[in-house]
């Protein structure tokens, strides 16, 4: 499950908005926020976000033991 707080934190560190991330994964901002709320991203979307946000350990964010919303 996705640790949304860590994802949002990394987005803030890299100064990326939801709209920016929507472009990165090729979706509308509405779809991006819906996917984040539902904690559902496909592997291509995760890969794109990891690359754009320069995430060193994606497991901590995208495969967290506890889900945060």
What residues fall within each predicted segment?
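Residue-level signal for the short linker/turn that defines the boundary of a DNA-recognition helix
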Residues: 15-16, 44
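Short, charged recognition helix plus adjacent turn
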Residues: 9-15, 23, 34, 59-69
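Recognition helix of helix-turn-helix/homeodomain-like DNA-binding domains
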Residues: 26-41
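Residues within the helices of the helix-turn-helix
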Residues: 8, 19, 47
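DNA major-groove recognition helix of helix-turn-helix/homeodomain DNA-binding modules
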Residues: 44-60
